[in-house]
Amino acid sequence: MRLDLYVITDGAIGGGRSHAEIARFACAGGADAIQLRDKACGPDALCRIGREIRAITRDTGTLFIVNDRLDVALACGADGVHLGQGDLRVDTARRLAPRPFMIGVSVGNAEEAISAVVAGADYVAASPIFATSSKDDAGPGCGISGLREIRAAVAVPVVAIGGITRDNVAEVIAGGADSIAVISAVVGQPDIVAAARDLRERITTAKEQYREKRDA
């Protein structure tokens, strides 16, 4: 599974575009995964949005994840759910949704990453790497050093999120991230397709350079 660019929807900064429109544009720009995130939306409305995005991502072969709500993820046929530290317990979610359904977990340090994997997480999201205004509850950044510690602690894919832009993405890849998750760097841009395409190209280039340096 290739998971370079992971785009999280956010209607508040999407320039009036719906979650489905954001997802469609991000997929057109080469996003490997779309996460539906809307803290204010009720479950029924979120399911309707989720089904729209599921149709889009099914056509493009893009992974579809729902933030927080396992019930919504299962109801709309998503590929997985992403859980925070204060959400449903990972082991409970895993009992309710066996693999191949995916479970991702936000972690702020190596200890949380190890606990998440032991409980059944398929990937962990090191969050936030840098300070960010896109998520009010993100907390202080763990930095590249924190990312390296998380990468060294677990064998599952590590997604990096928080304050990542086209200008610092190479540094984050060099720090050990398998995937880059963004909100404002894609969703908050005037041209989502172009922003996603540019960022994915930069991720690909950074990974190639990192492999060459590592193997030299």
Swiss-Prot record:
What is a GO molecular function of this protein? Answer: thiamine-phosphate diphosphorylase activity
Q: Keyword Zinc: yes or no?
A: no
- Tell me the Gene3D superfamilies matching this sequence: Aldolase class I
- Which positions bind Mg(2+)? 68, 87
Record-listed 2-[(2R,5Z)-2-carboxy-4-methylthiazol-5(2H)-ylidene]ethyl phosphate binding positions = 132-134, 163, 183-184
Annotated 4-amino-2-methyl-5-(diphosphooxymethyl)pyrimidine binding sites: 35-39, 67, 106, 135
**Cofactor(s), by name:** Mg(2+)
- Keyword field contains Cytoplasm: no
Matching PANTHER family: THIAMINE-PHOSPHATE PYROPHOSPHORYLASE (PTHR20857), THIAMINE-PHOSPHATE SYNTHASE (PTHR20857:SF15)
Q: What is this protein called?
A: Thiamine-phosphate synthase
Organism name: Methanoregula boonei (strain DSM 21154 / JCM 14090 / 6A8)
